[in-house]
Amino acid sequence: MTATKQHKKVILVGDGAVGSSYAFALVTQNIAQELGIIDIFKEKTQGDAEDLSHALAFTSPKKIYAADYADCHDADLVVLTAGAPQKPGETRLDLVEKNLRINKEVVTQIVASGFKGIFLVAANPVDILTYSTWKFSGFPKERVIGSGTSLDSARFRQALAAKIGVDARSVHAYIMGEHGDSEFAVWSHANVAGVGLYDWLQANRDVDEQGLVDLFISVRDAAYSIINKKGATFYGIAVALARITKAILDDENAVLPLSVFQEGQYEGVEDCYIGQPAIVGAYGIVRPVNIPLNDAELQKMQASANQLKTIIDEAFSKEEFASAAKN
């Protein structure tokens, strides 16, 4: 994709709850001029495309249709939400093997179409499936991106904002590491309108230290809470994906928390995709933003990466995945 291209095309692979919510977000936020939707349930996809097109008189012109893999050849962005859903009591990492098989099949067909754009991965476990998308595609690491901790960071900012009584957009704070149980809050660099969070709390007494611990736990475990109540999470991640999509298609050079390839940005963290802030634009990841972590945070980053690496190494020791790797 070039930054000057006017007609922006997105292909969505996976028309489940996350995918259809993402498609709706693209329509209502006037993002892209063309949206093709791929799913094994073609009739459902056709119905969604028709339903979404009925909103266009209220938004902006857009071509929306049920697509095939051949339609990926000239897409600027392919968004992968296809995968087995996370069930109550199941961790994101429990999904690994079945979703790796789906990922391999999907990515192979997309690359065969002649696709030269950017992959944006949202299926879980997202850090591992972003890595496998990079391996199976043979693409440069900058053009394979995962949604990473974008939603986790949004949940964190919203929870802090609600606790201290400000707009979430005035809270600047990140969750880093795995999108999952080993993620961690970067407390050392959290701030409210430029005021360090700890300085803010000292001056305003909005919450004590135990309150912060409880707040992080609620953020980390938010998906489990939602899944237990309604079966799946999809609205929050859909809007996060729409935000990332806009940053790419509009060449924003926006700083967003994403699943980014690691090659020594942090000591002891290499050869995996994991959540950290990065600058993203029309050509994918421009560069990671390496927040200076304190010793405790760095240890958490290393532990999170080691957990992911153990699972990745085990998965790619199997012939069915190792033989398909191009990177």
Swiss-Prot record:
Pathway: Fermentation; pyruvate fermentation to lactate; (S)-lactate from pyruvate: step 1/1. The keyword GTP-binding does not apply. Allosterically activated by fructose 1,6-bisphosphate (FBP). It catalyses: (S)-lactate + NAD(+) = pyruvate + NADH + H(+). The active site is at H179. HAMAP family: Lactate_dehydrog. The modification Phosphotyrosine is found at Y224. Gene3D superfamilies: Lactate dehydrogenase/glycoside hydrolase, family 4, C-terminal, NAD(P)-binding Rossmann-like Domain. This is L-lactate dehydrogenase. PROSITE patterns: L_LDH. GO terms for molecular function: L-lactate dehydrogenase activity. Its EC number is 1.1.1.27. Beta-D-fructose 1,6-bisphosphate binds at R157, H172. Its main location: cytoplasm. Substrate binds at Q86, R92, N124, P125, V126, D127, D152, S153, A154, R155, T233. Belongs to the LDH/MDH superfamily. LDH family. Pfam families: Ldh_1_C (PF02866), Ldh_1_N (PF00056). It comes from Streptococcus equi subsp. equi (strain 4047). GO terms for biological process: glycolytic process; lactate metabolic process. Homotetramer. It is found in: Cytoplasm. GO terms for cellular component: cytoplasm. Keywords: Allosteric enzyme, Cytoplasm, NAD, Oxidoreductase, Phosphoprotein. NAD(+) binds at V18, D39, K44, Y69, G83, A84, A122, A123, N124, S147. Catalyzes the conversion of lactate to pyruvate.
